């Protein structure tokens, strides 16, 4: 069982040496899937890759991403959503759209802060923000507002924050011109950066891509992922995880963040995928034992060939194999 003193010094070889390992998707619960899918496809240009309905459990999953021409097919001839980068999974529990009292927790309101936002990176941020405003999209922060004038935050139908940044930056060799919109990163707040960085690097094999310290506001941002393609930058690639540390939280024994899966619910998880998810999970179990919490362990839940483990703050991470038929 993970505690505030748990450390993660042991490197998982299957994670650090597996070139097939990738940060696959981010899961958000939504109240009304028709409204939300329309929002992301019409305003941002995402495509609905797949919809999966689970009648017995009364929920549906919607998988979206920005247009890609390199998504392989699974054995059923469908897009293998678990082999792609930059996928957004929307989870709809049936009936919530008809409940006037049902409200999603967006992760940014006390006392239920934890998940922060998803981030889309664009070529021309001024043009993008102007177009979104003309289409009636609401904003939490416009470019002209706040301290940082080069980022904006749009609001999704359920109140989730969508950060908007540009990858067109002076002094960067790549990308060459516009490469379309990108699902750049997912942000979660963390209590103790030492523990979280150890976990994501040693247990899950991620690399620290960039650090951004903000002394006046007393917080630090850590950006992790499984590398940056040669023709991309850390701002134009997809599947980055941003960890936000507000200074001092690590010294408060009573402090904790909301993981999105206890009530009130909202954020669900990030998902990593690889060719042999079972072997990855087995090595983690063998080397860390009960220091890491699983719910469930690989192949032991209602849905087979998947696992969920928890990070130091209790956020869930799904582990699945490429080609999974859900």
From Swiss-Prot:
SUPFAM superfamilies: Glyoxalase/Bleomycin resistance protein/Dihydroxybiphenyl dioxygenase (SSF54593). It catalyses: (R)-S-lactoylglutathione = methylglyoxal + glutathione. Keywords: Lyase, Metal-binding, Repeat, Zinc. Gene3D superfamilies: 2,3-Dihydroxybiphenyl 1,2-Dioxygenase, domain 1 (3.10.180.10). CDD domains: GlxI_Zn. It holds the Pfam family Glyoxalase. The active site is at 163 (proton donor/acceptor), 318 (proton donor/acceptor). It comes from the Eukaryota. GO terms for cellular component: cytoplasm; nucleus. Belongs to the glyoxalase I family. This is Glyoxalase I. It comes from Saccharomyces cerevisiae (strain ATCC 204508 / S288c) (Baker's yeast).
């Amino acid at each position: 069982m993970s505690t505030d003193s748990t450390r993660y010094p042991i490197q998982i070889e299957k994670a650090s040496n597996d070139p097939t390992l990738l940060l696959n998707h981010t899961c958000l619960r939504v109240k009304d899937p028709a409204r939300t899918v329309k929002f992301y496809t019409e305003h941002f240009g995402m495509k609905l890759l797949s919809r999966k309905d689970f009648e017995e459990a009364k929920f549906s999953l919607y998988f979206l991403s920005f247009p890609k021409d390199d998504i392989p097919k699974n054995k059923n001839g469908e897009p293998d959503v678990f082999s792609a980068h930059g996928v957004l999974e929307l989870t709809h529990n049936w009936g919530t759209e008809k409940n006037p009292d049902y409200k999603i927790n967006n992760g940014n309101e006390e006392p239920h802060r934890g998940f922060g936002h998803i981030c889309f990176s664009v070529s021309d941020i001024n043009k993008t923000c102007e177009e979104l405003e003309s289409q009636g999209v609401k904003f939490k922060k416009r470019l002209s507002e706040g301290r940082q004038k080069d980022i904006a935050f749009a609001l999704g139908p359920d109140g989730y924050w969508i950060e908007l940044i540009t990858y067109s930056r002076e002094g960067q060799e790549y990308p060459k011109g516009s490469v379309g919109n990108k699902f750049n990163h997912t942000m979660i707040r963390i209590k103790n950066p030492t523990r979280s960085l150890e976990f994501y690097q040693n247990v899950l094999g991620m690399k620290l891509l960039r650090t951004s310290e903000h002394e006046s506001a007393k917080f630090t941002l850590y950006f992790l992922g499984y590398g940056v393609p040669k023709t991309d930058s850390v701002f134009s690639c997809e599947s980055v995880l941003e960890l936000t540390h507000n200074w001092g939280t690590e010294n408060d024994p009573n402090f904790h963040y909301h993981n999105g899966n206890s009530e009130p619910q909202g954020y669900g998880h990030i998902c990593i995928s690889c060719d042999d998810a079972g072997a990855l999970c087995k090595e983690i179990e063998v080397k860390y034992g009960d220091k890491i919490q699983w719910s469930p362990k690989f192949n032991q839940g209602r849905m087979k060939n998947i696992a969920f483990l928890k990070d130091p703050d209790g956020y869930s991470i799904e582990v699945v194999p490429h080609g999974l038929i859900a």
